[in-house]
Amino acid sequence: MGLFSLTQELAIDLGTANTIIISNGKIVVDEPSIVALNQHTGKVEAIGKKARQMHGKTHQNIKTIRPLKDGVIADFNAAEIMLRGLIKMVKNNGRLFSPSLKMVICIPSGSTNVEIRAVRDSAEHAGGREVYMIYEPMAAALGAGLDVEAPEGNMVVDIGGGTTEIACISLGGIVCSESINVAGDVFTEDIQTYIRQQHNMRIGERTAEDIKIAVGAALSELDEEPEDFEVTGPNILTSLPSVLSISYNEMAYALEKSLVKIDAAIMKVLEMVPPELYADIARNGIYLAGGGALLKGLDRRLSEKTNIPFHIADDPLRAVARGTGIALKNINRFSFLMR
């Protein structure tokens, strides 16, 4: 893009846990979806990684806010501040003036008109001149390398931070889908609850996330067992420091109730799939995307439950962002993009 380029094109995966921005086919921003605001002055103290480092460690003057909950905007003002700040992180590449922004943003497939409007308004207030929307399962399918326009059935399960999106896709459209509010954030809460109830220890959200990444599992028996994860925190009864060694077996137990809900949602969508498309899915398998796809043994668990092979998309954390980037390059071709 030259010095006088009038438009900058951005693909944005506005996630509950992380926001990823793609420009010119490259990931230019990958930050936690969180802002830190000064309560007295209203000044933005930090956005993204710096704000996450403050999360759970602030004093009363500074508040950290996660603007999205369950995949949708929960705090409009904070969402706008965050989006504006993250867009500023995208380099202007030597342009002489700020270009107008063309954006494609992904949204949960179960979004209401009000929720879609909130995303659009946030994007426009943050500088978006042309704003398009794409449903997350469609973006996940594109990011997983599937031909979404083909006359055959493809199925994706995208387990993000706020929602799990399950969809059957054919001929550039979503044939049937289900969106449930059981995903990464709920897994994190499950871990906090388990450690509190079973080990009498309080841990914060960040520590629970670290446990999830290190030893989070969907099966109590794995072929490759990860090393136990050590945690330090206060004992609830004594307030004295204690050290725990957490195994993946424990985490499989802690997450079981939530995983059963995801199992059920997948079965519900499979029941809705027309027979001809079902045959395609049984042959091609189902694709897993999102951070939840990284739970150890999840693909095997789901394959055993459904008798259908499950494939983890390449770099599942960024699959939705990649797909949104592909949609951005093909705005005029893909009829499923919404204005």
Q: Model-predicted segments: where are they?
A:
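Nucleotide/phosphate-binding catalytic cleft detector across ATP-hydrolyzing
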Residues: 1-159, 167-286, 293-339
